[in-house]
Amino acid sequence: MTNGSAPSLYERLGGVYSIATVVDDLIDRVMADPRLNANPLVDEAHHRVPPAGFKYLVTEMVCWATGGPQQYTGRSMRESHEHLKITAAEWEAFLDDFQQTLDKFGVPEAEQDELKAIVASTRGDIVI
C-alpha cells in the first residue's frame, strides 16, 4: 500500500503465498473433477501438463490480475483453452470448484466478488 491508497486485491488476499495456497487447492480440485474430465480433451490436458507448472502459471496470472508485482508469462486464455472445446456446463463446473476453494479458505465476500469478476472476464476466451 502506497501513498495512503486502498490496498490492492492482491494485498487484501495476502500476497503471493496466500494466493499460491488457494491456487494449489483449486488446481487439485479442477484436475480431479469428473465433470471436467468427462471432456476427453480436458482429461488429456490434465494428464499431459505437470500440475506444478500449471499451478505456477495460474498463481502468476492471479497475482498479476489482482494487482501484484508478478508478470504473467503464459499463453493467452484463448490460446491455452480453445483446443479443449470447453462447454458452458464445464465452465459452470469450474466455477463450482472455484467457489468451493474460496469457501474452504474463507475468502471474504467482497474479495470473492472481485475474483469472480476477473474470472468471468475470461469466459469468452475459454468457452466454445
Regions found by a protein language model. Give the residues of each.
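Core of compact, soluble alpha-helical bundle domains
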Residues: 1-128
